[in-house]
Amino acid sequence: MENFKGLQKSLYIWTDSADLDKRVEQLKAATGGDVALENVHRLSFSSYANSSFDLIVIECAQLTDSYVKLLHMLKPSGKLHLVSYIGPAASLLQEIKLSGFINCREDSPDALTAEKPGYETGSSARLSFAKKNASAVNVWKISGDDEELIDEEELLDEEDKQKPDPAGLRVCSTTGKRKACKNCSCGLAEELETEKQSQKATENAKSSCGNCYLGDAFRCSTCPYLGMPAFKPGEKVQLADNLLKSDI
């Protein structure tokens, strides 16, 4: 028991009273502290406070449900020492580990030692990863005014802002102009003729309510502009040929 030197308060759990005083004196000499006595059969009725002892020694006893209680009775980093135990060492070591002890080991063929963790049961500790990183916090303090943003208008030239003329989108592949050649075979002649006929048909199309340009919500049920987007007053809008023909 030289490893227990300096432990101030110990509990000796006994089963046989023969030479009990001698064993207690040996434990006092090894630890240099006070030793309390408790009978193994009275252990379940005892009312020791938690974290009361630095060392608990059990001699010639087999415990099944009391290791957890002994764990609470020990101070953090306190030691449990079993001498002349009953049963296989491997089974006892596993039972002690499952009760919450650590560093369980077999010191000799008839002695086992275990330790209580260095913290009290139910205690808490602050985790390091919960600390806020100062640099990460400062990121949210960056002002948007410090960022140099590109003006979207500077990305466009004056030519980009001009709308293309629909009349000049398609030209003849031969003349390079929007005018069909004599023997047109690209379809431009038919397209120009269709536009011409449509223009003639829609020249006399007038609004009877004056709200056609506002959109479908303001148009009557027979409005020829139904389905078309809103347009500016006086803006020329080309209607399809089938909208000017009677359904009957």
Swiss-Prot record:
Region (Linker): 130-161
Pfam families xrefs: Anamorsin_N, CIAPIN1
Annotated motif Cx2C motif 1, positions: 209-212
Fe-S binding site A as annotated region, ranges: 172-186
One example of a Gene Ontology biological process annotation: negative regulation of apoptotic process
Domain of life the protein comes from: Eukaryota
Positions of [4Fe-4S] cluster binding: 209, 212, 220, 223
Stored InterPro entries: Anamorsin, Anamorsin_N_metazoan, CIAPIN1, SAM-dependent_MTases_sf
Entry binding sites for [2Fe-2S] cluster: 172, 181, 184, 186
Family: Belongs to the anamorsin family.
Function noted in UniProt: Component of the cytosolic iron-sulfur (Fe-S) protein assembly (CIA) machinery. Required for the maturation of extramitochondrial Fe-S proteins. Part of an electron transfer chain functioning in an early step of cytosolic Fe-S biogenesis, facilitating the de novo assembly of a [4Fe-4S] cluster on the cytosolic Fe-S scaffold complex. Electrons are transferred from NADPH via a FAD- and FMN-containing diflavin oxidoreductase.
Family matches, as PANTHER family: ANAMORSIN
UniProt-recorded name of the protein: Anamorsin homolog
